[in-house]
Amino acid sequence: MIAWLDPQDPFPPVEHALGPDSEAPGLLAASRELSPQRLLLAYRQGIFPWYSSGQPVLWWSTDPRMVLAPPALRVSVNLRKTLRRVLRDADWEIRVDHDFLAVMRACASTPREGQDGTWITDAIIAAYGALHRNGLAHSVESWYRGERVGGLYGVALGRMFFGESMFAHRTDASKIALAALCAFLGNHGVAMIDCQQETDHLASLGARPIPRAEFVAHVRAATAQPAISPWRFDKSVLERWAGTPAAPAA
């Protein structure tokens, strides 16, 4: 049995989440409300929302938790070649927070293997949009010849980044954005990106599962640190992975 949360109710301890032998491992609570304030409380405790349209808001704290250390991003030979091409080619850009809501909508409309529909509902878009307006959620976008072709978004609290979703309309476009994000976060002392749930795709990028207790302890410490400011970078951060200087701007 999981807790039902009224607006004033705190989250139960994450240890109360359903266990690995249940039908929904990691499910902790449900609510009708999805406010920016509730989201911030959740993230600082290692909890995230994930639900489908027509369901109540479902809150999760999975054990183990999938995380990516920015320096551990796995850059394949082919991706490294792509990053070098991006650095040389003026048609490629990395833009930060250019159109956060458009990135969310692109993530929502991208088909996912094994998923019908999307969990990025209108309520999710509204709540994360409010966080973005307050400087707490960010998008990293890959642009090619003036068109957004890939990107990702997530929540940034202190020195912790909580990844939410990504999309690509061109080969490796989301990985380009992720490589830029990892380089930027690594430069600012961020040790861990939350990837939430274990998938083969995340593992192929260098993410690994860690015990929930270890994750929650790290989140508490990292979110108490000063926030990164400003969130401003371009594709030159990709030099970390490509080993090639970016071409000078025309």
Swiss-Prot record:
InterPro entries: Acyl_CoA_acyltransferase, Leu/Phe-tRNA_Trfase, Leu/Phe-tRNA_Trfase_C, Leu/Phe-tRNA_Trfase_N. Its EC number is 2.3.2.6. Transmembrane segments: none annotated. One of its GO terms (cellular component) is cytoplasm. One of its GO terms (biological process) is protein catabolic process. It catalyses: N-terminal L-lysyl-[protein] + L-leucyl-tRNA(Leu) = N-terminal L-leucyl-L-lysyl-[protein] + tRNA(Leu) + H(+); N-terminal L-arginyl-[protein] + L-leucyl-tRNA(Leu) = N-terminal L-leucyl-L-arginyl-[protein] + tRNA(Leu) + H(+); L-phenylalanyl-tRNA(Phe) + an N-terminal L-alpha-aminoacyl-[protein] = an N-terminal L-phenylalanyl-L-alpha-aminoacyl-[protein] + tRNA(Phe). Keywords: Acyltransferase, Cytoplasm, Transferase. Its main location: cytoplasm. Belongs to the L/F-transferase family. This is Leucyl/phenylalanyl-tRNA--protein transferase. It comes from Cupriavidus taiwanensis (strain DSM 17343 / BCRC 17206 / CCUG 44338 / CIP 107171 / LMG 19424 / R1) (Ralstonia taiwanensis (strain LMG 19424)).
